[in-house]
Each structure stands twice: as C-alpha cells, then as structure tokens.
C-alpha cells in the first residue's frame, strides 16, 4: 500500500513510538534487494558459513525481501543499544584514531583493557544479561500493531528472519559496514542490536551514512584466529563466535589455543574499534552482567548438571549452546589458561557422560600438564 499521502505524520509517529519503546534509532529504507546479495551467495559457495546450513536454506529469501513479504515497500530498521558502561578495548592511539578519520582531540579518555580475569572466562557482551530476542520482540509487536491500524502488513525480525539485516540497516543510514563486517555507528560504535519491520506501507527512505573507517585495520589486526581474511570478509569457520556458539561438534584442535579464555562468543574485533570510544550507556539494565554469572570461575561451570545449567542461564542467550556446548568451551579455556588447581574438576569432566565434554576435558588436562612440566 502506498502510504505517501499523509505518510509524513505516520512516519513521525513511528519514530516517536520507537523511541518511547527504547530504540536508539529508527530509520527507513526501500525494500530492495540487499547490496551484498551476490557476495553472500559467493560466501556460501566457498563454504565459509561452516555448519550454519540454515543460511543456505533461506538464501533466496535473504536476497529478495519480496519473497519474505510480497508487496513489501519499506524496511523499518531499528537499533537498540546494549552497552553497559564498561570501558571498551585497549587504549586507542592517536595514530589509530587519525587512520579511522577520528580527531584525537575529540576522543574521550576512557579506554581500558576489558579482558576478564583469566580464571573467570569471557562471555561476549551481548550475552551478559537477558536474551535480547524476547525483550525486543515485545517492542516490535507494539510497532506492528500500530502499522496494522494504518492498514499495513508486516514481518518483524530480531536477527532471526531471512534478511541480510546489515545491508538494510546500512541502506537506512543506521550505520556503515566496518571491515570486520559489523555495522558501525558514530554514536553507538558497534554495541547495538538490529531489528527490522518489513512492511507493505511505503515511506520515504533515509539517506545512507558515509563510511568512516578510513585506513584503520584495528579490527582485522585484533582477530585472534585471523577470521577476518580481508576487509569486509569473514571466514566463519575460524571465528571464535562461530566456534563457541554455532559449531555443535568438536572445536578444531589447531584453533583451540587461539580461543584463550573465551567461553561464549568474542568481542575482540569490536573492542578494537576506535568508534566504540563514543559508545553511550544503555538505559536498559536487562543486558547487564548477571551477578551469579559474574561470580563464576571457569572450573565452577564444570560442576553444572543439566538442571543447574538451565537455572543459571534461564532467559539468557548462553542457553543456546546447551550444557554440552558451554562446558566444551570451558574445557578449552581451562586448557589455555588453567592451572594444576583446575585438574580435579577437569578429571571429573573427562568422565562426563557427554563425549564432547569428555574429549575437550582430556585435551585441557594434557595442556595444563605440559605447562606444569615445562
């Protein structure tokens, strides 16, 4: 439906409603084919998506919004800030800032190394608190209801739908494509969730943003496994987020030492970005680190049975790995940073009924003993 007549008022109301719901940005793009549809297909053909076969199953839809929602006219793209206020990344030098097109005089002096104590393990920031899908989906339902009252038909997604959401977000001017493939925004850095409302209503599009990465390659240089193989190209099979979340089987032995103390996801390419120096603190406290998780040491996770795991990570993104996946990751982290004090817990894990946990625990024991002997 063409909503151009009188759509300015409706458009303004949508933006106001989105802000009332807590979204930091609400912008509009035409429901056109995504800019990188061909590159996405090539990436799949090279096998760089690893075991994320669901991406290939919906490839046609991802490359054509009309297959997702016939007669779609507009993609309303929303950004929800999840930054909790901790300093991000190692200090960014003035030279790095200039390379990124940022004036050092405008950079706040708030950078610090955010690596957690090695005995605790690291969880990606987006998974510190509650599952963002549940929180944001409720907000999208409110927007959907508003648009229905204006005769629109919608499909609403929080990174789970068949859309190349970063392309639509870039087209709407929410941000620009960083060399890590993450979307960057001058006021939020990279610490925001994307959500989309694909609608049959037509609204004037917003202009895209300029790319402000300049010559900066800090995200590429920061990747522990070399997963960013070139600017704007990521081989998921080497990405720590893929290895610790998406991969269901054993983590390749050659990549295990590079994972360090990370047990769920990885923020290294994000932490390295100079634009995250401008990140604004989110008003949404649901994404703050849970106290009971913050108190855990790596070896404590190995004592979790299925029920304790469910209780600890109820309504958390971490539950996605299930017990077997998280404890697999914990064993790898202990193999990298653990001490002889962790051996009793690992020896118990090596007898776990889940073969995936047992094998990784055995590997970790071997690694610690090698360091102890050395």
Residue ranges and their predicted role:
Residues 300-305, 312-317, 345-353:
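Alpha-solenoid HEAT/Armadillo-like helical repeat scaffolds in large eukaryotic proteins
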Residues 1-92, 110-212, 251, 260:
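Auxiliary alpha/beta "docking" domains used to position bulky ligands
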Residues 23, 218-242, 262-286, 345:
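Iron-sulfur cluster-binding cysteine motifs and their immediate structural context
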Residues 312-338:
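C-terminal accessory/binding modules appended to enzymatic or scaffolding proteins
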Residues 323, 353-354:
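Short inter-helical turns and helix N-cap capping residues of alpha-solenoid HEAT/ARM repeat scaffolds
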Residues 42, 76, 189-198, 228-256, ...:
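Non-heme iron-sulfur electron-transfer modules
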Residues 327-337, 359-370:
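Structural detector for internal amphipathic alpha-helices that build alpha-solenoid repeat scaffolds
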Residues 310-312, 339-350, 370-374:
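Amphipathic alpha-helical scaffolding segments comprising HEAT/armadillo-like alpha-solenoid repeats
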């Amino acid at each position: 439906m063409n909503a151009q007549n009188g759509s300015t008022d409706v458009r303004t109301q949508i933006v106001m409603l989105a802000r009332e719901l807590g979204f930091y940005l609400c912008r509009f793009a035409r429901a056109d084919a995504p800019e990188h549809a061909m590159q996405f297909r090539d990436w799949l053909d090279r096998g760089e998506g690893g075991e994320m076969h669901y991406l290939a199953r919906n490839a046609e839809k991802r490359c054509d919004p009309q297959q997702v929602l016939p007669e779609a006219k507009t993609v309303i793209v929303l950004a929800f800030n999840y930054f909790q206020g901790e300093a991000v990344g190692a200090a960014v030098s003035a030279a790095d800032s200039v390379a990124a097109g940022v004036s050092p005089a405008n950079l706040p002096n708030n950078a610090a190394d955010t690596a957690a104590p090695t005995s605790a393990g690291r969880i990606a920031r987006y998974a510190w608190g509650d599952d963002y899908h549940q929180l944001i989906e409720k907000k999208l339902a409110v927007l959907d209801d508003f648009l229905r009252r204006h005769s629109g038909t919608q499909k609403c997604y929080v990174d789970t739908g068949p859309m190349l959401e970063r392309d639509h977000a870039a087209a709407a001017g929410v941000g620009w494509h960083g060399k890590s493939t993450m979307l960057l925004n001058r006021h939020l850095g990279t610490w925001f969730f994307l959500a989309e409302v694909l609608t049959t209503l037509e609204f004037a599009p917003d202009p895209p943003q300029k790319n402000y990465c300049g010559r900066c390659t800090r995200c590429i240089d920061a990747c522990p496994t070399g997963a960013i193989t070139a600017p704007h190209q990521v081989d998921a099979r080497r990405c720590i987020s893929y290895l610790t979340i998406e991969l269901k089987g054993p983590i390749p032995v050659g990549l295990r030492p590079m994972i360090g103390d990370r047990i769920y996801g990885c923020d290294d390419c994000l932490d390295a970005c100079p634009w995250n120096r401008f990140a604004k603190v989110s008003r949404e406290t649901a994404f703050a680190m849970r106290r009971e998780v913050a108190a855990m040491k790596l070896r404590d996770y190995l004592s979790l049975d299925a029920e304790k795991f469910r209780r600890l990570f109820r309504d958390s993104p971490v539950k996605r790995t299930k017990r077997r996946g998280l404890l697999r990751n914990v064993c790898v982290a202990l193999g990298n940073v653990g001490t002889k004090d962790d051996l009793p817990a690992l020896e118990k894990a090596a007898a776990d009924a889940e073969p995936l946990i047992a094998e990784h625990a055995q590997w970790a024991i071997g690694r610690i003993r090698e360091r102890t002997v050395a």
